């Protein structure tokens, strides 16, 4: 999610000129599994919301445990696991550092929507291979973005849901004791919840707009939770404020934004003619971001996570401190619904 994101084409519409709509964006596409190599699950192509560069993501089955990102350029390859200890940035996005054989590093940014979908669909063995679809102005690049698509997680859900895995014993993190991290009025709280679920609750204000949203993922009977996710959380788009556009453009951000991939706030309303896609879309998108960020723990966190006006930086700092304070303990979710600590195995 791009907190306080404002994009280029949306603002031109606010000034009375036209913008590019989805019907004109033939670059965003999905390749079916049937016409692809056996290991290729899907492909998505689209623009990076900050860089404005077109990127292809090829999602493949992998023998490696977990989710991995990779990128190749000039005969050099870079990769990283999708884990919080590979974090490289949390400014208006979540980014990880990919390393190669050389000392050079490449950052993979805007991973949170993809990660949220992969997490909810319980994927454990996939690799997301990113490739630029145009020649960069410089010989080497230091950042590549996961495409923003329509600004939500819907297209990622469609692409990833067929790859869902069924495990006889699912590794999890158990919230073993209450923990709270605050930065001023912004707070995150982890609470013990003796059930096979992860509960999310968010409340916050966006200018003059106050919103709340919640979501519960039941890891034992996930289909119902996934259906709820598709209705309440996945459609929520990244958003930002109209008045922030000049500052962001001056920083080289939001170059790929449009009304097709972002919900733009202006006062107590929205620039987008259709307004919100779902009720409390802003708060729902904050939960989407939180799911993607906390998925970097590598395993589901069983417990309740309450967020007040939190964003990427607070999410990842709270996760780090939760581990450092031994608030998250390894465990397993068994098919009969029992949740046991790793020490009990």
Q: Which residues fall in each region the model found?
A:
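Short acidic-hydrophobic catalytic motif
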Residues: 2-345
């Amino acid at each position: 999610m791009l907190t306080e994101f404002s994009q280029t084409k949306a603002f031109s519409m606010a000034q009375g000129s036209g913008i590019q709509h989805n019907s004109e964006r033939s670059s965003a596409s999905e390749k079916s599994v049937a016409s692809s190599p056996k290991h290729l699950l899907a492909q998505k192509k689209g623009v990076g919301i900050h860089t404005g560069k077109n990127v292809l993501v090829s999602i493949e089955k992998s023998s490696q445990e977990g989710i991995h990102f990779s990128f190749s350029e000039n005969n050099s390859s870079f990769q990283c696991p999708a884990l919080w200890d590979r974090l490289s940035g949390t400014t208006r996005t979540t980014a990880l550092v990919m390393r190669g054989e050389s000392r050079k590093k490449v950052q993979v940014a805007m991973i949170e929507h993809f990660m949220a979908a992969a997490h909810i669909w319980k994927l454990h063995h996939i690799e997301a291979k990113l490739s630029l679809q145009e020649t960069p102005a410089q010989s080497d690049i230091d950042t590549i973005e996961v495409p923003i698509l329509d600004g939500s997680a819907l297209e990622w859900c469609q692409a990833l849901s067929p790859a869902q895995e069924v495990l006889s014993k699912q590794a999890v993190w158990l919230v073993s004791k209450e923990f709270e991290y605050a930065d001023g009025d912004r707070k995150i709280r982890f609470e013990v919840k003796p059930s096979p679920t992860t509960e999310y609750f968010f409340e916050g204000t966006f200018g003059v707009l106050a919103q709340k949203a919640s979501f519960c993922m039941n890891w034992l009977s996930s289909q119902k939770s996934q259906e709820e996710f598709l209705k309440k959380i996945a459609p929520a788009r990244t958003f930002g404020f109209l008045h922030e556009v000049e500052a962001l453009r001056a920083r080289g951000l939001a170059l790929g934004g449009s009304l097709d991939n972002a919900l733009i706030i202006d006062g107590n309303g929205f620039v987008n003619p259709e307004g919100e896609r779902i009720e409390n879309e802003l708060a729902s998108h904050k939960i989407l971001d939180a799911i993607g960020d906390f998925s970097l723990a590598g395993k589901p966190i069983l417990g309740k996570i309450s967020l007040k006006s939190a964003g990427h930086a607070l999410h990842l700092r709270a996760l780090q401190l939760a581990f450092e304070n031994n608030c998250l303990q390894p465990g397993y979710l068994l098919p009969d619904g029992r949740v046991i600590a790793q020490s009990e195995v």
